């Protein structure tokens, strides 16, 4: 199929525990991101292209080696950044091919067009949202992006998926925000209806 959606695959990381959601997971790391975070964890993700453009069926064949681990542990496949929601049609196709019992998780900034959120909401069991900071000024200074787009998409995702399927990560970023900013972000997110949080200190490793 010439128009079959493909994913810009950088790497697969197997047998991960407690990092990308519950259970044993495989992280699918892709290229491409709409943000330009000042301290990007993996700067390769800002480059155009990727080592391989892979179809959903091809990816399934590579990750199904851990099928028993996924089923036994309540784990599955986590798509991470880059920004997986840039490839929402691919995600929907992968979901349709994946065996029952696999959990599909998406790590996302939500800095994408709204229609991508609508499609992705049908493709995932859980969303891990990296909101950076709820202050528009801090968000723009750190990411170069528009916080209002993220918030609008978060509201949309809450309506489509429900709070129980959303975990929001709020990092403490040296030189950009403070613990007080973290607490303020958490309070703002609670007012939106978010119930699951991960407040953590940012690591400068791999920079």
Residue spans for each PLM region:
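N-terminal [4Fe-4S]-dependent radical SAM core
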Residues: 1-48, 65-73
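Conserved H-D interstitial segment of serine endopeptidase catalytic domains
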Residues: 51
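Conserved AdoMet/S-adenosylmethionine-binding subsite of the radical SAM
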Residues: 64-68, 73-76, 80-81, 85-206
């Amino acid at each position: 199929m010439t128009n079959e959606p493909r994913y810009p695959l950088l790497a697969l990381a197997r047998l991960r525990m407690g990092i990308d959601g519950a259970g044993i997971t495989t992280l699918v790391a892709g290229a491409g991101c709409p943000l330009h975070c000042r301290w990007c964890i993996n700067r390769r993700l800002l480059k155009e292209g990727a080592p391989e453009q892979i179809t959903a069926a091809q990816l399934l064949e590579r990750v199904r080696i851990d099928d028993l681990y996924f089923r036994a542990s309540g784990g599955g496949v986590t798509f991470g950044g880059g920004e997986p929601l840039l490839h929402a049609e691919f995600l929907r196709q992968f979901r349709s091919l994946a065996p029952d019992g696999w959990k599909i998780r998406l790590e996302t900034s939500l800095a994408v067009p709204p229609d991508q959120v609508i499609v992705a909401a049908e493709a995932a069991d859980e969303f891990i949202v990296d909101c950076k900071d709820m202050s528009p000024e801090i968000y723009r200074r750190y990411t170069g992006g528009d916080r209002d787009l993220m918030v609008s998409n978060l509201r949309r995702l809450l309506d489509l998926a429900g709070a129980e399927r959303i975990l929001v990560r709020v990092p403490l970023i040296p030189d950009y925000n403070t613990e007080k900013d973290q607490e303020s972000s958490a309070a703002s997110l609670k007012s939106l209806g978010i119930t699951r949080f991960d407040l953590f200190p940012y690591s400068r490793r791999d920079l």
